[in-house]
């Protein structure tokens, strides 16, 4: 009896919800396919004029080398150039120093026989075609996927065999 009352109440609530949605949809003009089509009589809006460049103050083109194609009065040679840093020789002491970071970044600072200067096109530094860690990141993912697939297959097979043995009759011969 209680189940019949619950089903009747659910039916009434569902009917009221559908009736409310239908009434709201008929009264609203929110969705109209005519809104998606352009009016053929509309003229394109004119573009706003570009603002004039300020005469002084902060300018992003100052950060670009050579002025960024700047104004008429600027010359590319007016900006002071930083002094180039001479390479610092260092020995193979076995430790890590700041010059090792400069070698890896390809900024020089390496002694003779170092592979990280980047100018020889060796494996270290920025001169290489691809980073050394890229292939290493691919292999563990593939191995993990294969191991997960094999583990799933084995567990599935074991569950199938247990189910098969569970329903076997005690006195019958193996099939």
Curated annotation (Swiss-Prot):
Pfam families: CD99L2 (PF12301). It is a single-pass type I membrane protein. The keyword Signal applies. Residues 29-137 are extracellular. Widely expressed with high levels in lung, spleen, thymus, liver and spinal cord. Expressed on leukocytes and endothelial cell contacts. Detected in a wide range of T-cells, including CD4-/CD8- and CD4+/CD8+ thymocytes. Expression is much lower in peripheral T-cells than in thymocytes. Residues 1-28 form the signal peptide. GO terms for biological process: homotypic cell-cell adhesion; myeloid dendritic cell activation; positive regulation of neutrophil extravasation; T cell extravasation. Residues 30-137 are annotated as: Disordered. Homodimer. Interacts with PILRB. This is CD99 antigen. The gene is Cd99.
């Amino acid at each position: 009896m209680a189940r019949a009352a619950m089903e009747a109440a659910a039916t009434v609530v569902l009917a009221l919800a559908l009736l409310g949605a239908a009434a709201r949809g008929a009264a609203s003009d929110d969705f109209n396919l005519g809104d998606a089509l352009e009016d053929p009589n509309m003229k394109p809006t004119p573009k706003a004029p570009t603002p004039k460049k300020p005469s002084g103050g902060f300018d992003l083109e100052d950060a670009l080398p050579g002025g960024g194609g700047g104004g008429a009065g600027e010359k590319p040679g007016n900006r002071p150039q930083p002094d180039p840093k001479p390479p610092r020789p260092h020995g193979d002491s076995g430790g890590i120093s700041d010059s090792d970071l400069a070698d890896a970044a390809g900024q020089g600072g390496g002694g003779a026989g170092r592979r990280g200067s980047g100018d020889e096109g060796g494996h270290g530094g920025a001169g290489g075609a691809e980073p050394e860690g890229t292939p290493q990141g691919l292999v563990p993912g593939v191995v993990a996927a294969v191991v997960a697939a094999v583990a799933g297959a084995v567990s599935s097979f074991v569950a199938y065999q247990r189910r098969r043995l569970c329903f076997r009759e005690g006195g019958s011969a193996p099939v």
